[in-house]
Amino acid sequence: GRYRPGASGYATANLGLLYDWNHTGKGLKVAEVVENSPFDHSRSKMVAGVIIEKIDGVEIGADMDYNVLLNDKARKKTLVSIYNPQTKERWEEVVLPISSSAFNTLLYSRWVKNRAADVEKWSNGRLGYVHIQSMGDPSFRGVYSDILGKYNHCDGIVIDTRFNGGGRLHEDVEILFSGKKYLTQVVRGQESCD
């Protein structure tokens, strides 16, 4: 068999926030609350510009690696102490941090949403935007749904395949957009792309 080393260290959770790295004082200055993240709900007062002063009662120093305060905290109640420098208000909120992979998924959704907004703006609403994340069936179904659904009224579609993990979706995408089968791929005597 193949040797695989065991996991070492802690899994570091994430609060679902983007930070202002130009902030030089104590704490973490919030630049953005990522959509669908732990603080993105109606009861939270978390907004861009506030400072996270403490996590579970531990003060975040100016040069401190705050990540250690989130080790092994995914889906566990975590107390976050917040300060709003504009209103001078301090408060605490309890959240359930998410895993790094869950945060990466949120960042991907944010990236796609921002690209779609750019395309809509630059084309004056004439073009839609889809990103093909991977060359597999779930990604194809999402593209198909977007093209025939929310972008049905558009004059064209920007198809983005950057950072695509690869696969065998190219035939399906070509047929979707052209209506014609341009290739028959035969592997060991059987058509593999029907």
Which ranges hold each PLM region?
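Short, surface-exposed beta-strand/loop micro-motifs that present aromatic residues
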Residues: L15-D20, A117-K121
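PDZ/PDZ-like groove recognition
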Residues: L18-V34
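Structural motif
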Residues: V47-E53
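Cleft-lining beta-strand/loop regions that shape enzyme active-site pockets
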Residues: R2, G6-S8, K29-P38, V58-D194
